[in-house]
Amino acid sequence: MQKLTFTFIVSLILTLGAAGQKISISLFNNLKLSTVLITPTSGSYRLILGDNEVELKVNQILYISRSGDSLMVRDANQNMGTWKRVTVVGQTGEDIIRVKPIVPASPARLYDDNLSFYVDLDRIFAINLIDQEKYVAAVVEAEGGLNREPEFYKVQALIVRTYTFAHLNKHLAEGFNLCDEVHCQSYLGRSEKNSDILDAVLDTKDMVIVDAERNPITAAFHANCGGQTANSEDVWVKPLPYLVSVSDRYCLGSNSSTWERSIPIGEWKKFLSQYGVDTLKIKKNSDLDFQAKTRPKYYAVMGVEIPTTDIRKHFRLRSAWFSVSAGKSEVRLSGRGYGHGVGLCQDGAINMAQKGWTYDQIVQYYYKGVSIVKLTELDMDRIRVDTTLNNMVEPNLPPPGMEFPQRPPDR
């Protein structure tokens, strides 16, 4: 696969700690782009086509279309030729550009800083080369929601920056650092809806969360833990000393803290039989009942233990913490929490911030034995990044409907 060839790409691959560091993000990564429309909306841009440079005016429309393994460029007045790479470079540091996929069609988004386009794998790749702190702010806005306390945004900024630093080379073989899908981090364009977010990012500039060995942590988080977070090994097999279960009363007032679900009893029994439960020996439906006063690892029925995480995945439940009450024709699940339950509980952290907790107090409550440090304090040559829990992103779940109507999957 082609690699980005700008000379300034080399330094960003080596370290995230330098001032003004840029990182490269593949945009609309889930789409097989063949035509995009770009429009500068603020600042000043230069369009680079081979050895030629052209000034792009604010609101000037530019079409970029795939033509074989090259890109055809045109504006409203003329065809500007066919090129292997099209680069758009901001000149002021406060440059904003609109990107609108035409084929396939998708809503437009606004992005900061620079863009590069090239063809590979029979599609256009659109790469945003962006200042790392602007990127962090954009992800905080996408994953943390709006109208939150500044201390909560600082917590989210630390989580996002820690993940970014730990996974900087995730897509390096494909020619960029990260993509905009949730398996990297949800990136829906520039942060512009709440100035508190950018302030929080700048207040925590270059800070990350590290474990006792000063390695970046797996900064897992979820929407609501239901009153108790989960041990990492109960969800992802591997134990991590900072991802341990903690009691959390701060999320219990949230609408996401409890849920209900009814499942036809025949469907429930069919699922149980896949785990070796002899459903013919069930004499009465109440034999299926199960009470979970604390977060359970298994659902025990007829001498068989079934991982609650398996049940959650199969039935697409909001969490793996639930009790079971069987009636004549259906089983009723009464659940707690929303998400995998490991690490930071967003609803709990939001409430803590409202009650006056500081960002470092919140971080150290949910992640045990960690420290918050500047990237410049770390020994880049000895840092070890644990990638064994990379596949933490869950399938899309039913929307909780109240406080976070479009919450991203847990990370």
Description of each model-found segment:
Residues 1-2:
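N-terminal secretory signal peptides that target proteins for export/translocation
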Residues 5-12, 17-411:
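Conserved, single-site charged/polar hotspot
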